[in-house]
Amino acid sequence: MKDNIELTIFTPEKNIKIGEIKEVITEGLDGDLAILPNHVNMITYLKPTITKYIDLNGNKNNIFTSSGVLKVEDNKVYIICDASEKPEDIDIKRAENARKRAEERLRNKKEIDVKRAELALFRSIARIKIKEL
């Protein structure tokens, strides 16, 4: 049995190899997921959220992950998503403006894609929350 898992995040712009860690906590469509060493192999959809991971020194880390897919296979965790950002890389003004635009679109539901506006709102809120941590 292995004591660690390996985390890699793939986006269209970049691959983020976090490396060996103790645990990943993220949010799937049905709620929170905690992935520990020797987790059963699985694939699930993810919501835009703050993904948390604990490194080998026990430090808690956060990274924004947008909607996507999580795959667990043989103590390797792969997150494939549209975007991923570390807290220090998030432009808070841009995230706040995106939240305001999404909220306005949802208030005026005429001729908009509600699901798309909701996802934009979820992404912006997660980005804002991670900056507040």
Curated annotation (Swiss-Prot):
The source's domain of life comes to Bacteria
Disulfides per UniProt: none
Membrane topology of the entry: Peripheral membrane protein
The Gene Ontology CC terms held by the record are:
plasma membrane; proton-transporting ATP synthase complex
What are the recorded Gene Ontology BP terms?
proton motive force-driven ATP synthesis
Q: Which InterPro entries match?
A: ATP_F1_dsu/esu_C_sf, ATP_synth_F1_dsu/esu, ATP_synth_F1_dsu/esu_N, ATP_synth_F1_esu_C, ATPsynth_dsu/esu_N
Alphabetized Pfam families for the sequence:
ATP-synt_DE (PF00401), ATP-synt_DE_N (PF02823)
Q: Where are the transmembrane segments?
A: none
Instruction: Kindly list the places in or outside the cell where this protein is found, as annotated in its UniProt entry.
Output: Cell membrane
**Subunit details for this protein?**
F-type ATPases have 2 components, CF(1) - the catalytic core - and CF(0) - the membrane proton channel. CF(1) has five subunits: alpha(3), beta(3), gamma(1), delta(1), epsilon(1). CF(0) has three main subunits: a, b and c.
User: What does the function comment of this entry state?
Assistant: Produces ATP from ADP in the presence of a proton gradient across the membrane.
HAMAP family referenced in this protein's UniProt entry, alphabetically: ATP_synth_epsil_bac (MF_00530)
Its recorded name reads ATP synthase epsilon chain
Q: What is the primary gene name for this protein?
A: atpC
